[in-house]
Every structure is written in structure tokens, then in C-alpha cells.
Amino acid sequence: MSERKLFTSESVSEGHPDKIADQISDAILDAILAKDPEAHVAAETAVYTGSVHVFGEISTNAYVDINRVVRDTIAEIGYTNTEYGFSAETVGVHPSLVEQSPDIAQGVNEALEVRGNADQDPLDLIGAGDQGLMFGFAVDETEELMPLPIALSHKLVRRLAELRKSGEISYLRPDAKSQVTVEYDENDRPVRVDTVVISTQHDPEVTNEQIHQDVIDKVIKEVIPSSYLDDKTKFFINPTGRFVIGGPQGDSGLTGRKIIVDTYGGYSRHGGGAFSGKDATKVDRSASYAARYIAKNIVAADLAKKAEVQLAYAIGVAQPVSVRIDTFGTGTVAESQLEKAARQIFDLRPAGIIQMLDLKRPIYRQTSAYGHMGRTDIDLPWERLDKVDALKEAVK
């Protein structure tokens, strides 16, 4: 009998407390970048019942009304009713932002490669904002070259938000979570969905039976292709039996606590650094995007069925200290060839990544819910497939 395996990933909605924090941090980043593209930003957010704290380090000459940005973001998510215990107009907003450390700034603003050498390449000027390792990944399981479990998990909670905001399911509230377990065959190909878990916040009057039926009919069956569902697929809808108290009233939230949701759902490794609230000189963010860009173009070029790219940096140094590509035995060329090609085709210095992906723009708020990778609903530069031909040519 052939061996089959299960793999599970989860996602959370824009109304989840940690995601509220991520969206506020990225909304602040975007507001600053819109006025000052050269700004350095590290904005952290904590949310809980009736209160938002924004703290961190910023270097900019621009003025941004933090209070207004916070309230507008909360309102856009859907927290506009005081019954939710967290409302855009009544929440207390407490900003505490200071200037970036000059010790860090000197390494970012003048990389090791250019110190004492005025003739260096200007793209060597910016050093990495910190040491660290970052991963990017792609696999040919979906059209967007993402693992199927996380792709479906994101689509489920996004569908819930659409139904809530349109009023089609009027009893839905903003907080929600999804989890999808996919069965893989002996060739590591997805063959069916084994389990779907959805927990969604709701008004107190609605029955569990109504929620169960609506979620199956209007969410699950609208999102998951019927070819993946069968009579053995298990559905757990609000398995606690009640989810009225949610959002920051039910649980505190912090920026950067959903890094696996933000990336590949645990299917690929993660370097540990969060994204939201950070400008592109922070390689936690920009190099993760670059690594995804490389991996996606490798798979799209049919040079591997799956590819994981690791980049690593030293603080204040422009060039990465290592580039590693793993194709898990699915590659059509040697991994060393792919690593050499990646270094040739993709400029992996922080300033090179920023230029290559045009990262000084206010594009980050839209990434802060429903995943930073594999998005088909928005145009993100690291999702483009414009390096396929160059990669094919480089490994001939």
C-alpha cells in the first residue's frame, strides 16, 4: 500500500489581534514612506481591550498623524462597533516612537564595503540593518507556486472577510482563523483535503447550525476545489461552540507574532524575523522578499519542482555572507549552478534589493493580512516572473 502523508497550515483574518497589530505597523510605515521614501522605520504595535500602543524607532523628517492612521486602519478592518470591545473611534492610542540608534544607523547608511573608499559602487552604500538569515520558497502545487495548505487557508479567511464586509453574512464579526490539512501521495503531490477547521467570530443571536451551514456552503465549497473534497473530509466549524468575544477584547495582539502565516505555513523553513512595520533596509523583510523572488522564478523556469533559498547577512555589510539553494531532489540542474546564477541575476545587497523590487514605496499595508507571498489579488514585485528566461540562459 502506498504511503500517504498529511500536512497542515493555518491562517488568520485581518481582524485577528496579531494581524491588527501588523496592519497598524505597516499602515504607519506606508504613511511615512509616502512622505519620506528614505525614512528608516521599525514600528511595533500592541493591541488589547480598548487600547493600542505604538512604539519603536523611526528616522524621518516627515510628520504623520499616528493617531489618525491607527484609527483609520482599525475602521477599515471592521472594528466600528463598541459592542466588539474594541472600536476605531473609542480606542485609546498611545504612541511612543523614538529616533533610530545612531550606532545602527551608521552601519546602514555607510556599509563596510564603502568606508574609506569613495569610488565604490553606490549600491554598496547601504549595509544590512541587522545580521540574520532569511528564507524564500516556491513549489508547483498551485498556480501561484505556493504550498496548497497555506494557499487554501488564506483564501478561506479572505472569503469570510468578503462575506462580512459585503453584508452577505451579516452576523460575522472581524476575528477568524482557518486551518487546512492536505493529504499527499507517495510522490509528494497533494491529492485531497483531509480536514478543514474554521473559527469565526459572530453575533450572539445566530445559531451554531446556521454558522456551520453558511461556512460550508458559502466559504469552504466556494474556495476549495471539489476535486480535493470527498465524503471523508472532516469539517470543524467553531468547534468550541461559541465565538462572540474576539479580537483584542478576547486576546492581546502584537506585531510579528504570525510569521508562519505570513510566509509558507510551516512548509518551508523560516529565519525568525518578522516583516510588518519595517522599512526595506531591514533585511528580515527585504531579503525574504528577494529569496521568494528567486525561488519562484526557479520553479517557474522548470529548473525545479520546489526550491528553498536561504540568504544571510552581517549587520553593516552589503553583500550577503551566504546564498544557499535547496531543490529537495527535484532540480534539473545542480544546486551550485542555481546559486551561481542567482548571484549573477539578482542583486542581493540591501540597496540592490530595494532598487530591484522598488521597495521605497508605500506598498506594505496590503501585505499585512492574508500572506506576503503568493498573492494573486495584488501586484507585488517579488511575485513577478520576469527572471525566468535569464535563469534558463544562465544554467545552460
From Swiss-Prot:
Its EC number is 2.5.1.6. Residues 100-110 are annotated as: Flexible loop. NCBIfam families: metK (TIGR01034). Transmembrane segments: none annotated. The keyword S-adenosyl-L-methionine does not apply. Mg(2+) binds at residue 18. Binds 2 divalent ions per subunit. Binds 1 potassium ion per subunit. ATP binds at residues 16, 175-177, 242-243, 251, 257-258, 274, 278. InterPro entries: ADOMET_SYNTHASE_CS, S-AdoMet_synt_C, S-AdoMet_synt_central, S-AdoMet_synt_N, S-AdoMet_synthetase, S-AdoMet_synthetase_sfam. SUPFAM superfamilies: S-adenosylmethionine synthetase. One of its GO terms (molecular function) is methionine adenosyltransferase activity. Keywords: ATP-binding, Cytoplasm, Magnesium, Metal-binding, Nucleotide-binding, One-carbon metabolism, Potassium, Transferase. Gene3D superfamilies: 3.30.300.10. This is S-adenosylmethionine synthase. L-methionine binds at residues 57, 100, 251, 282.
